[in-house]
Amino acid sequence: DLYGNETWTMNDGAEAPGDIIQDAAKYCPRPFQKDRVRFEVADGTQLPYENLSFDFCWSLSSIEHFGGAEAAAEAIREMGRVTKHGGIICVASEYRIDDSSQRHPESFTREQIEDFIIPADSKLKLVNGMSWKLPPKEYLDNPINTLTEDVHRRKRHVVLRDKKVHWTSFMLFFRKS
């Protein structure tokens, strides 16, 4: 999940150097088997792979950038399409944990997760459910990171604040039936 058009990213607006797709080994700190890895540019809502191609699909903090809950659900359906029966899909994204009236397009509310993300594909069954237990209130009153300083990882939950929106991450595992 590398993006090339956000103003918040490094490398003159790109999250990664422009030649990383052509020469990934140049940026990898360890050797890897080049014949077993392929780097591609693709649209997460229209994956360029055959049905049932993969045993495992993983989306790490990507679907929140696709244009809302409906587009995120479409990306999960695409992951389901390319995952083999019995395969696993892992999705990590941002969860807006307060009921703030502030809108933040790159995080999901509980309702969006329940209405769009979890039920995106009827062939994908949530593994071990979803816990909605939130961190203690003092974590919300004193968030770890206001996007101006480093993340503090000694606390159990990492709660972030962007303006008045409090959010954290969630991770879901699905098994394809």
Give the predicted meaning of each segment.
Residues 1-46:
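Class I SAM-dependent methyltransferase SAM/SAH-binding core
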Residues 2-4, 45, 63-64, 95-98, ...:
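Short, solvent-exposed loop/turn segments at secondary-structure junctions
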Residues 42-57:
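A short acidic, Gly/Pro-enriched loop at the edge of an enzyme's catalytic core
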Residues 55-70:
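A short SAM/SAH-binding and catalytic strip from SAM-dependent methyltransferases
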Residues 72-85:
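A short glycine-rich, Lys/Arg-flanked "PGG" loop and its adjoining helix->strand segment in the class I
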Residues 86-94:
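Conserved beta-strand signature within the Rossmann-like core of class I S-adenosyl-L-methionine
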Residues 100-134:
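Conserved Class I S-adenosyl-L-methionine
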Residues 130-177:
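A C-terminal cap/extension of S-adenosyl-L-methionine-dependent methyltransferases
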